[in-house]
Every structure is written in structure tokens, then in C-alpha cells.
Amino acid sequence: MATLACRVQFLDDTDPFNSTNFPEPSRPPLFTFREDLALGTQLAGVHRLLRAPHKLDDCTLQLSHNGAYLDLEATLAEQRDELEGFQDDTGRGKKNSIILRTQLSVRVHACIEKLYNSSGRDLRRALFSLKQIFQDDKDLVHEFVIAEGLTCLIKVGAEADQNYQNYILRALGQIMLYVDGMNGVINHSETIQWLYTLVGSKFRLVVKTALKLLLVFVEYSESNAPLLIQAVSAVDTKRGVKPWSNIMEILEEKDGVDTELLVYAMTLVNKTLAGLPDQDTFYDVVDCLEELGIAAVSQRHLNKKGTDLDLLEQFNIYEVALRHEDGDETAEPPPSGHRDRRRASMCSGGTVGEQQGLDRRRSRRHSIQNIKSPLSAPTSPCSPSVPAFKPSQVRDLCEKDEEEEEEEEQPITEPNSEEEREDDAQCQGKDSKASSASGQSSPGKDAAPESSALHTTSSPTSQGRWLSASTAARSPVLGGTSGPEASRPAARLLPPSPGLATRPSTAPKVSPTIDKLPYVPHSPFHLFSYDFEDSPLLTKDKGGDSQTENRYSNFSSNSFQSSRPSPGPSGSPSYASSFSSPQDTRSSPSGLLTSSFRQHQESLAAERERRRQEREERLQRIEREERNKFNREYLDKREEQRQARGERYKYLEQLAAETQEKEPRSQSVSRGRADLSLDLSLPAAPAPPSPSSQSPSADSQEALPVPSSPPTLQCPQVSGKDHEPELEAEAGQGADEASQDIASAHRGAESQEEPVLELEPEERASLSEKERQNEEVNERDNCSASSISSSSSTLEREEKEDKLSEDRATGLWSTSLQDVGVNGQCGDILTSKRFMLDMLYAHNRKSTEDEEKDDGEPGRSAQEVEAVASLATRISTLQANSQAPEESIKRVDIGCLDNRGSVKAFAEKFNSGEVGRGAISPDVESQDKVPDTPPAQLKTESDYIWDQLMANPRELRIQDMDFTDLGEEDDIDVLDVDLGHREAPGPPPPPPPTFLGLPPPPPPPLLDSVPPPPVPGNLLASPVFNTPQGLGWSQVPRGQPAFTKKKKTIRLFWNEVRPFEWPSKNNRRCREFLWSKLEPIKVDTSRLEHLFESKSKELSVTKKTAADGKRQEIIVLDSKRSNAINIGLTVLPPPRTIKIAILNFDEYALNKEGIEKILTMIPTEEEKQKIQEAQLANPEVPLGSAEQFLLTLSSISELSARLHLWAFKMDYETTEKEVAEPLLDLKEGIDQLENNKTLGFILSTLLAIGNFLNGTNAKAFELSYLEKVPEVKDTVHKQSLLHHVCTMVVENFPDSSDLYSEIGAITRSAKVDFDQLQDNLCQMERRCKASWDHLKAIAKHEMKPVLKQRMSEFLKDCAERIIILKIVHRRIINRFHSFLLFMGHPPYAIREVNINKFCRIISEFALEYRTTRERVLQQKQKRANHRERNKTRGKMITDSGKFSGSSPAAPSQPQGLSYAEDAAEHENMKAVLKTSSPALEDATPVLGVRTRSRASRGSTSSWTMGTEESPSVTDDAADEIMDRIVKSATQVPSQRVVPRERKRSRANRKSLRRTLKSGLTPEEARALGLVGTSELQL
């Protein structure tokens, strides 16, 4: 066991601003550290030994010899590098020690807290000490920056006076001297903004210090210059002034003459400009300064005698840099502090002289200077020399050319909005002017063609041609270039064209190559237009006429640019051959200016109007193409489902044909049979999973082969007026059509691939208008496909989808969401209505007369009713038989979850003679073959209709939970299939091979085998629920009783009634329960007084009549029963109110707990009879409260049915949610585990470790072992096996996750009992079926039609949702079994796996893994941070970069006087750094504390800060370093041999001064249209 014995001390730094303390005690004691234990566990012993005043939680340990802080969570052995040199003898007999002191974060927090909360002298003392604190501890600066200390300084400084600001600036300067501090300032833009704000202060010292800090900031790194520009722009924009206004106020000497401030300000400008990498930013800054008048300030100081030499030098640097950037060849080379910005010239094929600024941005001085004197030698050969330009046009043209140059191969787009179109139009005008100027700069022989080209721009030929971006980019500079030369680059960039494009005004067509179009995912879809036939493709055989004709066809080239940002500037060497000679463009006849300008304006107006019309057509085409793309994906998906259904319905058709052959021919078919036949044919139509996937709209089907729906199920989409007659006609068809529906369904499935005819735009418009008018009616009728507008946009479809989803969330579910045809809509409406009526009135029929009475439909004959019953049973049988092939392989012993039993029930009903006149099912023959069939209860007609509803395909959605991905393949339980093969004796099959790659789960077997015959009926029978079952209500505990009085008054009733919050608040059925109509009764005080007085009067009379000692009330019930009822009445409204609430199903009067309470009080027949007899025997004696309440309840007809139905209604939403949400979680959890890569990494690592430890080669292991992994520990470090697995996974798979956050659904599933969930689902079905019986019983008595209709809709909705839940449950359980096979569980043990336990094992293991992984990553990150921290820990900015004391010598330094001066200055700087560094090195690299020196030794201690002179020495050294840095920045650097270039992103830009240097004459200003504009004033 290794140990380390050393001296320990503590430093009392509980007050971070007190920097005068020394380590204590002076004679340090020894403490022995164990190297194998974490230091945090040994810290308490050190704290107790030293009796330190610190809080134990705030302490840390620091090494005295290098000031490094030790990691308390690591051991000394792990920090061996930090202890290097710790035990070495210093040579003076003094040993190093470990210092116990306050943690950095605690000290920084205390500093910031004191700065925020102090004021007056305390704040002044704290700010004054701040610089010394940073000098004492080099680690404090880094922690201060991380803890948002800079924000604290800015906040305090913004509210303080100039003295406090000076203290803050001193501290900030100390921070910036450290590399860590400088990096913090770089990342904190608010600090730079605040420093620039202080430049505008009225106090000289504040301004001077702020300028010095900004100079140090800019000088530190060239990348800091753009940061300063951003800060300046942000501050001045917020103030509403132009950028750099504070600097210009100093240069204009508004507050008096201060040469030092002038030098600092101008140096800051030059250093900022020198660090800019691109030309645009350079000119933006320069132009702002020029607008603020720096040219006048510069000239005043340059021409004034006696100007300070340093200031004069800075102004000269600015002027030289500006002229050099403008391309002035006479300018001197820029000093090394400046560089040439890189230019991506477009003429790379020409000579160097031609490339030097051919298409480049110039300053504002430069441009107007050339316009003023066109005969003077321009800087650039291609600089414009005709006064047809506005100064802003120069920049706009440059911007266009550069954008076209960078984005020449990007897709063509349209502007986003009308504002962009107007901007594009303005840009077009500017481009046109630029083009005319370019044309006039050519020799005289080319002037006439150029002039004539102005008239031809509006011709049909030129209108029909659209130049691509790359061609349009060259057109402004194609002065005298011949046609073939100009078309050669186009031939390289554009694909060959079969011919010229058609005019955009022709009928738009979609190219067949639309699938190959580029798509930019980050751009809005409506920005893309792919008009292949509208895009012109230039050919080589077009001569000069073609170029002249298309000269001005590039007006909209800017609108063609993609909105996607450019990846960067790119040179285009292919442009070289397309430019004319520079010498040819220097002179131009100025007489064509007026006529050319006017003609161009006229042609531009016509061109703009034409282009606006073309944009509208293009936008329409864009929308159509995007919808085509949307519908194409939808159609591909639907086609696969149609093909799958087609196979299924082929088998259905065969069954139908056999049934019709065996069916008695004399059977007459009623209208109801036709309705059900229509409903039977519905499944042949595609069933869209959501309203968004509807039948494709007519105009979105252009040029696309769209499969149509069956003609018998969907009629063509015509105007909305034709829908209703078709509905009636289809509904009224007779027996002939009904007998053909089954065959037509198959024929319709075969005809699905016929293309749908396109509709003309006029028809689409009328259809869209009519459909919008009928939108509400269509949604109310639940017509999903043909009711959607065929020309609606994508946004409209999404809005309709949202609306339909809201309706679905409120419980208005409908099976007609699966239908797409008019016939289907009609059949669905009739079927839904008939379903509710049959569920209300259906029962075991005995005679025709009873049927007519019970149904309440005197108009229906006995033959019609019997036909409907026969056809209903036949449909149920056919649908069950159609699913028998796949059902036969997925039947499991689920009990009540088996929702198909129509075949057996129908056969039993037939054998009992009940279906004497009905159809004979072919399954009756197979019934005879099954011996010993156990007798079963007969199903009622409602059960058949329930089965029919279950057999219809529907959308698997429960509220907002989507189960649509549970397909029919999930109906197959792989366990049943495997059990069939496992009957033979033998060992169980091996598990899946490995988890390394996490392969997908195995496909369900026997998919390609022949479907087996239908299973005998006794195996398909489902439980019969024909009597109400006990609901087993549990007593839900309440809070404090709402009523404290014994008297039952109306006032107590009003206090009880309050809105009952149940899950479905948005349910449409709840809107009728508004208690506002009862408010007049509540506020009618006179009636309240009257009612109260009458009761009091009666009570007094009753007491008087009891004078003879007889009983005052009739008591019939026993005391226990009576007391229970009286106690229950204390929390219920008055009995009369209860009766009204029960009759009206008023949930505002009675909540769920009240209904449950009343259910326990329902009077029995015996109690009712006794109460009535006692009341008849003593009519004058009042009943007791309990007896009166029971008598009131007994007066309510069908009380038990009402209460149970009401309880089911109020409890359904919660129960459904409790069933559906766990199922959804389990489904998502299976997907999460299947697709989780981290789980695969963990299992593979664990498998490899186990194989090694066991000496085996196992392929897999049961996942139940995962719960034991954290318990296994190694024998050396006692760390768990999970820790080692986690470490290996993190090292080998850095992109792995923590697993726990990715399997949230599994964690939620671990808390669910799925056995109880299955029981709840069965109980939901039982209660729903019993509720139909309850509603039927209630409907026999007096019941409001609206209430009956609403309850019927609710129960129908619940039935559909329960059926969906059963299907979802079965499929999810089957999927879970497949998943267990996929995870390696042996098949024979899968049935015994408990879902809850399995999920809990995975979840708990994932939680343990996440905790362990965080600890491993934390340790790893600490080590990485420590290594990174040591790179800059305590490092000064003078040790690196420009400020380093030693810099490599340049290979070829110019010799001379300037070089000698620079060398002398360099040596001086090195001397300053060497003399100042020892003081700082003694203060900063070593522990920043003060120690006592031993006078007897006569030698200086290493703790040099113990002397009284050290603070001033340190401050002077730090200030001297800062001054030297600023001084070196203000002095002129040596010239650079190779100037650096700035990146140019826009062409032909010059500085503002060059553009406006000499001004304009009034005639030139009027010719350019500049009169009254800001350009003339500039």
C-alpha cells in the first residue's frame, strides 16, 4: 500500500478580496496520504488536523511548488504527473507542502456575488483588489471567465462612475494578459461592445484605457478584427448612428486636442483594416469612415504643420492601404500590417495586367473619380467611364456578377414574396443600365447593333429565351465578342438542346425527367421550378445576332439565383475567352446616353410587365410539380397495399361465388341487403391511413399515370352538384346490383392501374370552389377521398388533416375513413345508422310481429327484416371465412381477446333452427366432421353486427396514439407456428447467432405456404356476453366532504355543482351541458327564501304533532342500512336534484364518485315494497331521510341501467387511456431496442468478456443475466463488471449513447401489469355490450331523442375503439413474441416470459449503465480538460503570437536605418519582458500566496510576493507590458515582401472616397438621375 507523507498547511481565503494572508501554520504538520484512495475521502482528515476555518464542502488541495490544484475525486497515483518535482529539495532546506484552501469556483462565486451586491467604499475596495487577485492566482482568471465574470464586470461598470470604470478596465487588462482570459474575451462579444462604448466616454483616462485594450485585442489575432467590427456595428446600430461614430468623434477632436488619443484611435482603425481577410468587409468599414468624413480629417492633419509624427504615420498608412486596395498602381506598397485581399478574378485566361482589377470592387472615391474625368487613366482597364452609372449601381452589378459566378450551376428559383419580386425588378433595371453602359464602351461600329438591341428585347423571340445563370453572368461584359466565342462557354455549361424552348405563355408541361431534378432540402419547396422546355439552351450555331438579341435578357438573372447560401467564392477560368480586349472599352461616344437611356427604360417597363406574368405561371407550375412529388410517394405506397388486398379479395370472390350457388334462388333481396352489399364491397377500396393520404387531386395527376379506384366504388370527380344525385341513385339500386357487388369488387381491384383523365384548369377551379363550399358537409358525412378539393394546396390538405384529427380525438370515429368512392360513402352512412338502430333494438327474434314492435319501424315488412338478418349473418360468415386462412395460424388461447366467432355462432344458430330461411354457410359441412361439439350460448343479432363491425378493415388510431404500423402480418403469432413444428420430440432449437450487428427480427414463418383450410367452428368461438356483468366498483377516496350541514337545501346543491374535469374535454357531446340556464334560479333570492320558509314551517308542524310521543318519521330500514344511506347523502345533492341529474345524464350535478355512491344505495324490490306499504299505512307521517331517498330513486325508471351506462360513459376515456398508452409504449419500446446500436455494443462486449472468462464460445445469453452484471466485481480494484464493460464500450464505440435515454418506452412499460391490462380490455368489451342493453332498456321509457342519439353515437364510437384496441393488443403481443425470438430467447420459454419483468430488467440495467457511463466519461473528460488546461494555464499573451519575446527571423529582411530602429525596439521589448517576467513568474506560476522569508538564511524566498514591494513591482510590470504592447502596435512595422490578398466577393467595388472624390456637375447629376438623392450630397 503506497503512501505519501508530506507537510500540509491551510490558506485562509474565505474572503477572496483579502490577499494578504499567509499559509498557516508556520511550522506545518505532516500528513500521510494513501495513494490508492481518492483524495476526497482523505480531505476530512487534513481539515481536522489543521483545524482550518473553511467549510469542508468548499475545500480543495493545492500544491505549493507549482500552484496546481489536485482532483479530489482521483487518487494521488492517478495524478502522478502533477507531483513531479514536489518532493525535490529546494536547496534552501525548505520542503514543499500541500495547501488546503477554498475551491476556485467558490471563490469566484464569492467575488461575483460581492461585486453585484456591494456599493460605495466596499465596491471600490473590491474593484481595486480585483487586479491583484488575478495576479495572485493564475487559475482564477480561467474560472472567472467561465463563471460569467465578464458579464458581471460589464453590468457593474455600466452603472458606475469613471473611477470605478478605470478599476474595472485595469482588472480587465490583467485578464487579457492571460491566454485564458483573452480567449474568454474573444468569446464574449458583450465585453468588446462595452469597450467600444467606453471609447465614447467624456473622461480621457477611460477612453485611453479602452482604446489600449481594444488595440491589444485586435493585435492579438487577425481573426479578432471581424469581431470588433461586429461589436461596433451592434453598438452604433442600437444607438441609431453610423458605425465607427465614436472613433470619428475622437479624430474630429470634439472634446479637445489629445494627440495620444488620436494616435490610438487611428492605430485601431489601421489594425482593424489590416486584419480583414476579404475585400467586402474592408470596403464596408472604409466607406463608413468616408461617410463620416475621415478624408477631411486626414487631409487636415496631413497638411497641418507640426502634426505628431506617429499620428502622421498612421494617416499615411490608411491612405496608402486605401489606394492600394483600389488598385492604384502609383500607390506605395502597403506596410506589413496590411494585405491585399484575394480576388477571384473572372478572366483567368488573360494576362496579368488584364486580371489586375478587371472585375473588382473599388472604393467610393475611385468610382466617381473616373466618372468625373473619363479621359484620365483609370486604375482598372475595365473600369466604367460613362456617366450611365449610379454609384449604387456599381455595387449592385458587382453583387450580381459575383452571385452568378458562384452559383452558376445551382437550380433556378423564384423569389419568395412580392417584396423580393420588386427588389428583383429593381435589380433588373440596374443590370440593364450596366449592360447599356458596357455596350456603349465598345468601339463605334458596335454602337448601332447595341442600340438596336434595345428595341428587340420585347420581341417574341427574345421573350421566349431565358438565359441560365452562367450565361447571364457574362452578358453585361460581352462588348464586341462574336457569337461563337460567347457561346463556347455556354456549350460547356449547358446540356445540348434539341431546339429552342417554347414561350412561357404556352400550356405548361412537365418533363418526363422530373425525377432526376436536384432538390435542396433546406429551401422551401415553392422556390423550385423545373421548366425544362422553358429554359433556353444556347447552341453553337447562333452568331452575333443571337448574342445581340439576348443582350438584355438577363434582367431576371438575380431572381434565378438559389436562395441557398453559396459555399464560397470560386474562380471561373472558362470566362476568359468571353471578354473583349480591355483597350477596346476605354472610349465611348457620349451622345447615345440620353436616347439609349430612354429607350432602355421603355423596354425595361415592358419586359418587367411580361416577366411578372411569367412569374405567376411559373409559381403555379411549381405548386403542381410539388404536389406531383407528394402524390407520387403516396401512390407508390398505396399501390403496394392495393396489390396485397387484390390477392385477398380474389379468395373472397371465390367464397362469394360458392355461397351464391348454394343460396336459395327464390330468396328476395330487400333494400337493406343492397346497403349491406355495398358495405361488403367497401374493403376493395384503398384505406388511407390518414386524411392527408387521399386520392390524388386532378391537377396533381398531370403527366403522371395514376392508378384509379374501382369504377364501381368511385365515380369520376365532377362538380360537387353531381355528388348527391349519385348518392341517392347508388343507394337505391335493386337486387341485381346487390348481387353483382362482390364480383365488381374484384373487377375494380384489377382495374386499379388505369390512368385517370386530366381535368382542364377551368374544371379544377370550379371543382375547388364547389368543394370549399361543401367542405363542412363532406367532413360531417365522413367522406374521406372524393370530398377533398382536387386543386387544394399542400397547406390546405394539412389543415384538413388537422381538423379531421381533432374530430377523431373527440371520439367521432367512423369506418368511412376507409372508403374512397361515392358508393362506399352511401353504404357507410346507411350501415352506420343501421348499426346503431340494430344495437338498440336487436334481440332474439321470435315472430315477425314482435320484430316490428321492438324495432319501431312499422314501414318495414317481415320479409325485409328477415332478409336483412339473413344477409347480415351471411356477410359475417363470408368475412370470417375470408380471414380464415391467416386466422388459422395465429389462434392462441387468449380467451376473451379472440374477437372472431361468427362462423361457429352462425352454425350453431343454423343447427338450432333459428335461421330457417337464411343462407346456408359452406362451413356447416365441416361442422359435421367435428365430433363432440360442446354446446354454447346463442348470439343475439347485436353480436352478429358487432362481429361484422370487427371484420371491416379500419384505421388503427386511438385518440392521438397511432397504431397504423401494426399490419396484418402482426396477426400471426410465431409461437403458434413454431409449436406446430415442435410437436416432435427433440431438443429445443438454438437461439439466434449473435447480437453484434443486431440483425432485424426473423420474418414470420409459413408466409409462402398454402393457407390451411378454415379452422372448425368450436375453435373459433368467442365468449358470449349476453347478460350484464358485475362491474366491481372500487371506492375512490374523496377529500373533505363538500357539505358540512345536515340540512338538504337547494343552496347546498348549488355549491356541489361544478364542472367535472374528465379526459375528453373537447368532446362534442359535452357542449349541451351548460348550466347557465340554472343561474336565474341561483340568483333568485326571493324563491330561495320562500322554499326555506316553507320547509321550516313544515318542520315545526311535525314537531307539534309528536306531542304524544309517537315516532315522527317512518323508519323501515335497519339501522346499519339507514346510517350508510344518511352518511352517503351528506356528500350528495338533494334527492330531487339527483333524480333530475340521473334522468338527464347531467355530469355537472353528479360526478363519477357520486354515481358510484348511488350504485351502492339502489333499493331492492323488497325495500321498495316495504316503504310503499308503510307509507300507505301511515299517509300523514313523513318518511325518514333514508326511506325518502330510496323511494325517490325507485321512482326512476331503469335506475340500474341508467347508472351503469352513465358510469361507463364517464369512465371510458380514462380506462381506454390506461389500456392504449401502455400498448403504444410497448410497441415503441420494441422498436427502440431493435434499432438501438448501443445495446448491441454492450451485449457484444459482455459476450466477449464472458466467453473469455468462461473459456467457451457461446453465441448468446439470456438477457435476464443483465440484472446480475452490476453485482459482479473484479478482485483487484473491486470495480463492477458493468464498469469495465462501460469503459470498453466508451473506448471502442465513441458514438455510443447512455442507452437509458433512448429506451424511455421500455422504462414506462416496466411499470405496467400487462395481465391486468388484458383483463381491463375484456372488461371494457363486456361493459360496452352491457351498455347497449342498458340503452335499449332506457329507450323503452321516456328519453329525449337528442340524448338517445348522442348516447347511441357514443356507444358506437366506443365499440369501434374497443375493437381497435383488441386488434392492437393481439398484434403487439405477437410482435413481442417475435421480438423475444429475435433477442435470443428459446422458443419453448417465450410464453413464460413476463413482459413487465423483461422490461424492468432492461430498464434497470440501462439506468445502471447510464450512471456508470457518466462516471467514466467524467473521469475521461477531467483528464482531457486537465491536459488542455495545462497548455494555457498561467500562460501570458506575451509568450505566444505577435507578442512573444523571440520571433523567428525572416529569411530576407531589408537592411537599413528602419531595420536598425526595429531591431533596437525588438531588443528593448525583449529586455522589458525579461525584467518583468521574473516578478510575474514568481507571482503567477508559483502559488499565489504570501510566505515569510527567513532572515537568517540571507536568501530571497521563492515566495517573492512576501515582500512589501512586490505589489507595486507586479503592478508596474503588468502595466509596462501593456504599454509596450500598445506602443509596438502604434509604431510603423516594416514593409512586407509579398503583400497578402483579400478575398473579393463582389466585382468593381471601389472605396467611397474614390467614387465621390471630385463630385458631379449639375448636368451629369441630372443625366444620372441623382438630383436630390443622398449620393449627390455625399
UniProtKB/Swiss-Prot annotation:
Entry-annotated residues carrying Phosphoserine: 345, 376, 921
Segments forming domain DAD: 1515-1547
Pfam families: FH2 (PF02181), FH3_FHOD1-3 (PF24959), Formin_GBD_N (PF18382)
Localization in the cell: Cytoplasm, Cytoskeleton; Cytoplasm, Myofibril, Sarcomere, Z line
Gene Ontology CC terms, in alphabetical order: sarcomere; striated muscle thin filament; Z disc
Ranges annotated as spanning the membrane: none
Primary location class: cytoplasm
Name of the protein in question: FH1/FH2 domain-containing protein 3
Species annotation: Mus musculus (Mouse)
Swiss-Prot/TrEMBL keywords: Actin-binding, Coiled coil, Cytoplasm, Cytoskeleton, Phosphoprotein
Comment on protein domains: The DAD domain regulates activation via by an autoinhibitory interaction with the GBD/FH3 domain. This autoinhibition is released upon competitive binding of an activated GTPase. The release of DAD allows the FH2 domain to then nucleate and elongate nonbranched actin filaments.
Start-end of Polar residues biased regions: 368-383, 453-473, 584-598
Basic residues: bias regions: 1420-1434, 1541-1556
Low complexity composition bias: residue spans: 434-446, 553-583, 675-684, 692-701, 784-793, 1444-1456
InterPro entries with a match to the protein in the record: ARM-like, ARM-type_fold, DAD_dom, FH2_Formin, FH2_Formin_sf, FH3_FHOD1-3-like, FHOD1_GBD_N, GBD/FH3_dom
Feature: compositional bias, Basic and acidic residues: 599-651, 762-782, 795-809
FH1 domain span: 985-1016
Residue ranges with Pro residues bias: 985-1013
Compositional bias per record (Acidic residues), positions renumbered to this chain: 399-425, 751-761
GO molecular function annotation: actin binding
Residues of the FH2 domain: 1039-1435
Renumbered residue ranges of the record's region Disordered: 324-518, 535-824, 915-942, 979-1013, 1418-1462, 1490-1514, 1528-1565
GO BP: actin filament network formation; cardiac myofibril assembly; negative regulation of actin filament polymerization; sarcomere organization
